[in-house]
Each structure stands twice: as structure tokens, then as C-alpha cells.
């Protein structure tokens, strides 16, 4: 959707929350919901919800609200979930293994094809049928397989080297769990997940209320 190019990052970051909540409504057989009801459940104002959704089209009907199934479907398309994605995880430590064990990824269309590590005790093992390969084979694996997203779960001093290999092999999406900001070309999208940042935000908010 070309229109997405002009959508603010703030709106984009709210979309997964809409998607997740609508999924829960579907599981509970809820057919429709108003922006006011969404507001009460999701924590955004009704006006904000309407503005966000209007960025992508006219999904609601006055006096009726939103068809939950249709809205969930449309947001899925906006998020790119109408296509499957092949993923690899680089780093088979605690974070990498936790991600490999997260079954919801496959339900969303994210298929973890392989993991990579340097630890000889891990190489050759499988997590949910996902084989852990020697990181020395990362480049050759990428040359032979169609991979969309690379997830980096290695220590910070190795993260940029891994990112360089991914970029060299035309990976356009990187989910980075290493505590370092990566340097990549403009056409490569990086989503950083610095776990300590979230925790420090929490401690700041705790102290703000005291």
C-alpha cells in the first residue's frame, strides 16, 4: 500500500496492539466493536483510534462501529501478514531459544528456518525441529535459501559483523536483540529490541509515581 509511506511511525507502532486485541475478540466470538469500546479496552482515545484507522481507509460505520473480522483482516494486510516470511535466528542462547520456542510466530506466518551459533555444544541440536547450524555457514546458507528476516541474538561485539553478513546477502529486515545500534544501508529496516531500555522505562515510571 503506497499510502503507508506517509504514515507516522507512532501510528505504525500502534497497529500491532490493535491486531492483537482484535485477535482476542475473534477468539471470543465478538462480531463488532465501537471505537469507544476499543478505547476502553486498549488504552487509546476513541478519537486516536479513528484517526489511526482512517490513515488506511474507511473501516467503520457510524452507528455500527467496526466489523471485528474485517478490521482484523485489513490490519493483517497493512502489517504485511498476507505473505509468509522466512526467518533465521543468529545466536542460540537464551533469547534465541526462547524465540525459536514461541509458537505464535508460525501462526502469524513467520517460519523460522534455521538457527546459527558458535558453540560446538549447540551446533547440530534442534529446537522444535529447527536445526542449530555453525555460524561459519551463515553466508553460504543465505546464498542457497530465500530468507526475509534475520534475528540477531548475539553479544554486542559480534552483532555488527552478523548484520554485515545479512546485508551482503540482501536481507532487508533485521530484528536486533543485541544491545547495540547497528549501522546498515538505508534500504535495510532494523527494529531494535533493547531489553534493558524497556526495564529502565519501567523503573522511571515507578519512581515518577512515588
Swiss-Prot record:
GO cellular component, one term: cytoplasm
SMART domains per UniProt: CoA_binding
A GO molecular function held by the record: DNA binding
GO biological process, one term: negative regulation of DNA-templated transcription
Keywords carried by this UniProt record: Cytoplasm, DNA-binding, NAD, Repressor, Transcription, Transcription regulation
Pfam families: CoA_binding, Put_DNA-bind_N
Residue ranges of DNA binding: 17-56
PANTHER family, A to Z: REDOX-SENSING TRANSCRIPTIONAL REPRESSOR REX (PTHR35786), REDOX-SENSING TRANSCRIPTIONAL REPRESSOR REX 1 (PTHR35786:SF1)
Quaternary structure (record): Homodimer.
Protein known as: Redox-sensing transcriptional repressor Rex
Organism of this sequence: Clostridium botulinum (strain Hall / ATCC 3502 / NCTC 13319 / Type A)
